[in-house]
Structures are given as structure tokens and as C-alpha cells.
């Protein structure tokens, strides 16, 4: 399985925002933010590259984004449209291999090791896929090509937007040595800080530690760090990857109608959901709020972000955005719930932490 593998990672560029700019020419070239209203409890789902120049990023409170760029255009997500476009992209990928692992609406791994397309060249296939996505869907994508999933994912992030990077066995060591440790796939803020504390700032710094030393410091995560630093990742591309969700809900002892009281309860639910994500080594892109009224009718509201999350802070930013668009119609609430879906395995498990709530 490890010999002669050819893995492509396709990552759509600013997917939601790019679709909106494609469908609405008036948005092209302008700072566009897909997410919540800055005048209410809103959160940025994603934004155009024009908006990113101002320091705006996914999961940022919409009000903060507005302060950074008052001229930004804010629009609500159109999830059904994004799902339809995603299917178009994935259908293209499926023509190149039956081993396509969908990570989310906007990214996937493709194992083309046995594909005869483009004379068997993974690089040419990646270029052709990018060209077809642009011609048939009207969007750009970035591609990473390598001999395993870790390096293919790292490569696709290297030249965004609309780039392609190829990492071979010959150049992989140099590539990894120069990558900031915070850019390593699966290394979050907590692990990054812990690595910095032992003098690890780039991939090359990890090479100074033996496998035993890293395991001693990071437990099972140490073995993964040791292997990633050496370009080792034997995980197969899994087309049957099971989509799951993690959620918690609370039936209230007394029906309530005060929004601030609901937020306080949702904070506790979000904390429990975050703990479950950490324990199960998961993170997700889609946050769903469930509200059941005292007449036993219920509604759900969802938002899908561009990046994966697991921390209570980020979950609550989304929940506050979602509850702001719920029409309570003067009805009291008897149940509240939060679910995280579109899950991705957290390759390197983050240690549990006390959140500092800094953005």
C-alpha cells in the first residue's frame, strides 16, 4: 500500500464566497463575507480573498469583521446551492478514481495510483482536474500531489488560491523541514504551543527528537508527530468514510423565553459538545442549533464553516448567530440542543485545555 502511491488533495478556494461571486458579478473583486449579520450575533462562515486582506477569517465574529472592513458585503449562506456545486466537483473527481474520500463540501482526497488517465501522471491529472473544475463549474481549486495524504494535504495549502504543489520523495524532506509547525496537518493551537515550549517551531526542529522522546511528551500523538516529520503517513484513502455527528441537548425543567438565559444554557451545552469532540478525537464544520417549543414543535438552524472546529468559543459564536435568526413567535422554549457534523478526524489529539476565549 505504501509503494508508488499517488494521492491528490483538492481544496476549493474560498468555496462559498467564490460561488457567490460567480453567481453575482457585482460581488467580484469586492470584500465579501458569507455568514451572519454584524448588527446581530453573527459569525463569519467564510470570506473572499479580498476580505482576507483585511485580516478577516472564518469563525470571526461578524461585528469584528465589520470593524476591520466596514465596506465589506455581508450575505447569508445558501447551503443548498453549495451542496449542489459540491456534487458537481465530486462527480469530476469520481471520473479519475473510485477511491475518493470526501472530507467536506469543498475538499477531498483522490487516490490515483492505479488510474490510467493522463498516462498515469498524478500531476497531469491534478492539472486536468483543476482545469475541468474551472471550465465546468466556474471555480478555482488548489491541488496537492504527493505519495501520502499528509503531504498531499500540506501541498494543497502551499500555493493558494488556484495553485498546485507536487511533493516527491526526493523533495519531501526539504519541504517538511521548512514548514512552520502550526501548519502541520492536525496540529492545533494547544499542541503548537506545547511544541514551541520545547523548541519546535518548524518541521526540522521535530527531527531532533526521538520517537521515544515525543511519545513521552505527547503520548500516542508523539508517534504521529515523529512520522509526519519524516514524511510517513500510511493511512489509505477511504471512500467509505462514515459521516457522523456529535450533539447534546437539554430538556429544561421550566419553559423559558429570555434569550440571555438561553445563551447561558447553550454555553453549557457547547462546553459538553466540545469535551465530547476532544474525547472522540473529532472536529467538525457544521454547527446545528435545535430549539423545541412548549407546543412540542421544533426547528433547527445550521451553519457550515470553511474550517473545522471543536472549541467551545467557536461553537458558541456560531450558535449565537443561529439563535439570532430564530423566530420565537412569543413561544416559550422547553429544549435546546447543539450538534456538530461534517466531522473530520483530528489526526493529532489536542490535550484538553481551559479556553482563554481569545480570538
From Swiss-Prot:
The Gene Ontology biological process terms listed for this entry are: DNA-templated DNA replication; error-prone translesion synthesis; SOS response
Q: Give start-end ranges for the coiled-coil region(s).
A: none
Q: Which residues form the UmuC domain?
A: 7-188
Q: Where is this site: Substrate discrimination?
A: 16
Q: How is the cofactor bound?
A: Binds 2 magnesium ions per subunit.
* InterPro entries attached to this UniProt entry: DNA/RNA_pol_sf, DNA_pol_Y-fam_lit_finger_sf, DNA_pol_Y-fam_little_finger, DNA_polymerase-Y, DNApol_IV, Rev_trsase/Diguanyl_cyclase, UmuC
Q: What is its main location?
A: cytoplasm
The record's subcellular locations are: Cytoplasm
Catalytic residues of the enzyme: 107
Record note on quaternary structure: Monomer.
Function of the protein? Poorly processive, error-prone DNA polymerase involved in untargeted mutagenesis. Copies undamaged DNA at stalled replication forks, which arise in vivo from mismatched or misaligned primer ends. These misaligned primers can be extended by PolIV. Exhibits no 3'-5' exonuclease (proofreading) activity. May be involved in translesional synthesis, in conjunction with the beta clamp from PolIII.
What is the protein's given name? Answer: DNA polymerase IV
Amino acid at each position: 500500500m505504501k509503494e508508488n502511491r499517488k494521492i491528490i488533495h483538492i481544496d476549493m478556494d474560498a468555496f462559498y464566497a467564490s460561488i457567490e461571486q460567480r453567481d453575482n458579478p457585482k460581488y467580484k473583486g469586492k470584500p465579501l463575507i458569507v455568514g451572519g449579520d454584524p448588527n446581530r450575533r453573527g459569525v463569519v462562515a467564510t470570506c473572499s480573498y479580498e476580505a482576507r486582506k483585511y485580516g478577516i477569517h472564518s469563525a470571526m465574529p461578524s461585528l469584528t469583521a465589520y470593524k476591520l472592513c466596514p465596506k465589506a458585503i455581508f450575505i447569508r449562506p445558501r447551503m443548498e446551492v453549495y451542496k449542489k456545486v459540491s456534487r458537481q466537483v465530486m462527480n469530476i473527481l469520481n471520473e479519475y478514481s473510485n477511491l475518493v474520500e470526501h472530507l467536506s463540501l469543498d475538499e477531498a482526497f483522490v487516490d490515483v495510483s492505479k488510474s490510467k488517465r493522463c498516462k498515469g501522471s498524478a500531476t497531469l491529472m491534478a492539472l486536468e482536474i483543476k482545469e475541468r473544475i474551472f471550465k465546468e463549474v466556474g471555480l478555482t481549486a488548489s491541488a496537492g500531489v504527493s505519495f501520502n495524504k499528509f503531504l498531499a494535504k500540506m501541498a494543497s495549502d502551499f500555493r493558494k488560491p488556484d495553485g498546485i504543489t507536487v511533493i516527491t520523495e526526493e523533495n519531501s524532506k526539504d519541504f517538511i523541514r521548512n514548514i512552520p509547525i502550526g501548519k502541520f496537518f492536525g496540529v492545533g493551537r494547544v499542541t503548537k504551543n506545547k511544541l514551541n515550549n520545547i523548541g519546535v517551531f518548524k518541521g526540522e526542529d521535530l527531527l531532533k527528537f526521538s520517537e521515544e522522546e515525543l511519545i513521552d511528551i505527547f503520548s500516542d500523538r508523539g508517534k504521529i508527530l515523529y512520522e509526519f516529520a519524516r514524511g510517513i503517513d500510511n493511512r489509505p484513502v477511504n471512500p467509505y468514510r462514515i459521516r457522523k455527528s456529535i450533539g447534546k441537548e437539554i430538556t429544561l425543567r421550566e419553559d423559558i423565553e429570555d434569550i440571555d438565559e438561553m445563551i447561558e444554557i447553550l454555553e453549557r451545552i457547547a462546553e459538553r459538545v466540545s469535551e465530547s469532540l476532544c474525547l472522540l478525537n473529532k472536529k467538525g464544520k457544521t454547527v446545528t442549533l435545535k430549539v423545541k417549543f412548549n407546543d412540542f414543535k421544533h426547528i433547527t438552524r445550521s451553519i457550515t464553516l470553511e474550517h473545522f472546529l471543536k472549541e467551545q468559543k467557536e461553537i458558541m459564536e456560531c450558535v449565537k448567530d443561529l439563535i439570532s435568526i430564530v423566530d420565537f413567535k412569543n413561544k416559550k422554549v422547553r429544549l435546546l440542543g447543539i450538534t456538530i457534523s461534517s466531522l473530520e478526524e483530528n489526526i493529532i489529539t489536542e490535550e484538553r485545555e481551559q479556553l482563554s476565549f481569545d480570538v
